[in-house]
């Protein structure tokens, strides 16, 4: 049986950072378990995060009214995307597991990683309206976010000043990763790293390596299955009426995004259902 492959996408500029240490720990742990590890160190690569006409070679379909989604999708089908995008596609295609390592910035991913998502996850390659969520192209791949924060865990709690971390994670984990079909594993959250002493940092790194020993066996986070929705333009991609009726008797919504006007299930974007 061929070794599994992991892709680690790092979005931090400094090799002295804890994010870099987390990346190195992941490489070490996975290789020790027989994984082949690919890397995309976005700052070291000087990765261009800006979508533009330069992402496409050859003649545009409509140069006067350039529309990136349709032009990049066509370029993907015809093999006319820029070499740096194609290189990332090859890594993604080869990977069984994708780890995104980054510091939380303004309640989201760093700009360079946002640009990676926008340029690399083009229509046709990463999704179509006929192939999204459960049916997405990456449905047999697993992914997880490994995030550091400046603030403490309590700041991202239900009563914390920043609000619920589950809500912050939803646009990334559902709106990007699950949308493309990924099975999304529990995020690796490292809070307040700037105020964490060296011995505690070492414990975090060791715990991360320990987790990665069995990461492939982990249960993914729960997202509302596509089968609950009428997935067509005529129906508006809405939740089926019988499902809505069935859900009325439940105290909690299905997920952070599909809360149905009710309380959100606790830690829906942080802990997998047991």
From Swiss-Prot:
State the conditions that upregulate or repress this gene: By polycyclic hydrocarbons such as dioxin (Governed by the aromatic hydrocarbon-responsive (AH) locus).
Provide the cross-link position: Glycyl lysine isopeptide (Lys-Gly) (interchain with G-Cter in SUMO2): 251
Q: Which InterPro entries match?
A: Flavodoxin_fold, Flavoprotein-like_sf, NAD(P)H_dehydrogenase_qn
Q: Which residues carry this modification: Phosphoserine?
A: 82
Gene3D superfamilies named among the record's database cross-references: 3.40.50.360
| Keyword NAD listed | yes
- Keyword annotations from UniProtKB, A to Z: Acetylation, Cytoplasm, FAD, Flavoprotein, Isopeptide bond, NAD, NADP, Oxidoreductase, Phosphoprotein, Ubl conjugation
Subcellular location(s) of the protein: Cytoplasm, Cytosol
The Gene Ontology terms for molecular function here are:
identical protein binding; NAD(P)H dehydrogenase (quinone) activity; NADH:ubiquinone reductase (non-electrogenic) activity; NADPH dehydrogenase (quinone) activity
A matching Pfam family: Flavodoxin_2
Q: Which cofactor does it need?
A: FAD
Subunit structure, per the record?
Homodimer. Interacts with PDLIM4 isoform 2; this interaction stabilizes PDLIM4 isoform 2 in response to oxidative stress and protects it from ubiquitin-independent degradation by the core 20S proteasome. Interacts with TP73 (via SAM domain); this interaction is NADH-dependent, stabilizes TP73 in response to oxidative stress and protects it from ubiquitin-independent degradation by the 20S proteasome. Interacts with TP53; this interaction is NADH-dependent, stabilizes TP53 in response to oxidative stress and protects it from ubiquitin-independent degradation by the 20S proteasome.
- Cited function: Flavin-containing quinone reductase that catalyzes two-electron reduction of quinones to hydroquinones using either NADH or NADPH as electron donors. In a ping-pong kinetic mechanism, the electrons are sequentially transferred from NAD(P)H to flavin cofactor and then from reduced flavin to the quinone, bypassing the formation of semiquinone and reactive oxygen species. Regulates cellular redox state primarily through quinone detoxification. Reduces components of plasma membrane redox system such as coenzyme Q and vitamin quinones, producing antioxidant hydroquinone forms.
What is this protein's name?
NAD(P)H dehydrogenase [quinone] 1
Q: Which organism is it from?
A: Mus musculus (Mouse)
